[in-house]
């Protein structure tokens, strides 16, 4: 079953972000390694002191942005799915509360435990597993950068119940082992997870274990597909390139914890003579056009899953977390 503890804490992180308990980790092969400054040498992505500074720098910028409802204040510290989801949230917040979020309580992250993979080439990354002042879950951040001159940016932010944090495979020096995008030793290659999830949501199957974000989501869509005067259609697709590439770390059982990103659309179409009413201020803030007959909403979602080793018992991928956020809306 999917494990989805931790939702309440992350709902505080984003008013219209959908969240659950999440996990740690990441990775993917870098392409085009250049033989300069040791890019072909296998090295830790960062020293612990560097990781600590990166966490502090992100937290300072993040709290400023949340307080002011201004995405420009942490734009240099976020990327990938987090930039998409949280950036849209801040954009909506700025329109609904241009003076800022007066009720915002600064996020505090303590007891940081870093999972730092050793690899050659760029991009590089590491994971920070932290305690927060929001709840009892572990808040997990994935830091990435594309070169030695870049600032560390957070591409994933999610939460995981302490008991759900997986054990990572490490070498004798304590460095984690990254998995590649095309790792054939896993039940599903990381680069295929986004497409596999999109296919599953449309057609079902046995690629993913039952749970809230798999069988539960399909059941909910089926129930809401057609109601008196209103029909809903869904489209799902992977996001695999650049800062949205899947990332994973090997676990001690030979599987991996993998993060991946997907893109989702929901279109609501009203019957003739029926009006579409939009009450959510965040949807209104991000919406273009007038929803006279239809409303199309666009979401970005990042998932954290356990991808089992190929041939090791149950081959279904298990969800640990899903964080989704509205990024755009269009009325027609």
Swiss-Prot record:
GO terms for cellular component: plasma membrane. A lipid is attached at residue 33 (S-diacylglycerol cysteine). PROSITE patterns: PROKAR_LIPOPROTEIN. It is found in: Cell membrane. The keyword Membrane applies. Keywords: Cell membrane, Lipoprotein, Membrane, Palmitate, Signal. It is a lipid-anchor. Disulfide bonds: none annotated. Residues 1-32 form the signal peptide. A lipid is attached at residue 33 (N-palmitoyl cysteine). This is Uncharacterized lipoprotein SAV_5923. The lineage of its organism: Bacteria, Bacillati, Actinomycetota, Actinomycetes, Kitasatosporales.
